[in-house]
Amino acid sequence: MNIQITFTDSVRQGTSAKGNPYTFQEGFLHLEDKPFPLQCQFFVESVIPAGSYQVPYRINVNNGRPELAFDFKAMKRA
């Protein structure tokens, strides 16, 4: 399954308390049942160029809770 995500240039990078680097990037999820995109922060391995992408995803269940898992390596420009 694919979902459209529009990434912006807004990025937050840092180092965790354990010394691990992290990158969060702002994006907007385009859902079919919503008339407007939803603003989100995405944990990414590296900064993604701003723009709209079709991103494959799957739904996992972790400790009884559903979570979305995005495959940013397989995404394509929309």
From Swiss-Prot:
Disulfide bonds: none
UniProt cross-references to Pfam families, sorted A to Z: ssDBP (PF17878)
GO MF annotation, one: DNA binding
Keywords annotated in UniProt: DNA replication, DNA-binding
Matches recorded under InterPro entries: NA-bd_OB-fold, SS_DBP_Pseudomonas
Function: Binds to DNA in a highly cooperative manner without pronounced sequence specificity. During synthesis of the single-stranded (progeny) viral DNA, prevents the conversion into the double-stranded replicative form. G5P is displaced by the capsid protein G8P during phage assembly on the inner bacterial membrane.
Subunit organization: Homodimer.
Family listed: Belongs to the inovirus G5P protein family.
Protein name: DNA-Binding protein G5P
Native species: Pseudomonas phage Pf3 (Bacteriophage Pf3)
